[in-house]
Amino acid sequence: MKKTSDGFTVRTETDTFSAKKLILAAGGCAGSKVGGVMDGYQLAKNLGHHRTQLYPSLVQLKTDPTYPRALKGIKAECGIAIRRDNASVAENRGEVLFTEYGVSGPAIFDLSRAVSTGGEGLYCVLNFFPDWDLEEVLHWLHLRRQTMAAHE
C-alpha cells in the first residue's frame, strides 16, 4: 500500500489497484485475546495519519466485587450516573446487568467512555426507581416490610 500524488496504490501478489480514496478496515487492538492487533494503526501511520490516545470504550465497568457478585445474572432498568464529588459527569438510563466483576449492559456501555477518560475519583450511582420520588420509594418499602412481616 502506497500513497501517490493522485491517491493510493495497493499491490497484492497478483494485482495492483489504484484509487483516489482508500478505506482502511483493519479492526483495532480491542480483544487482543481473540486476535485484535495494532496492525491497522501502523498501516495508517505509514500513510501519514496519526492517532489519538487509545482508551477502552463500550465496555463493562469493574467494581468492588463484594456488591455485584450477590446480584450476578440479574438485569434491571436503572437510572445510572457517573459522578465525582457529588457532581454528575455523565448520566444514562437503561438496562444494567450485574456480573461477577461489576456491571454491564447497553446503558453501562454508553457511559464507559466517560469513565475511561474521566480520571480518578469517579463512582457509579444506580437508581432502581428512576420514575419515583423519595416519598414513593419510602411508601413502597414500608408496604413491602408489612407484607414480608405478615409472611413470617
PLM features: what roles do these ranges have?
Residues M1-G7:
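A conserved short coil-to-beta-strand element within the FAD-binding core of flavoproteins
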Residues T4, T12, R84:
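Acidic surface patches and DE-rich sequence motifs
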Residues S32-T52:
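Glycine-rich beta-alpha-beta "Rossmann" dinucleotide-binding loop(s) and their flanking helix/strand
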Residues H50-Q53, V59-E152:
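An anion/pyrophosphate-binding glycine-rich loop and adjacent beta-alpha core
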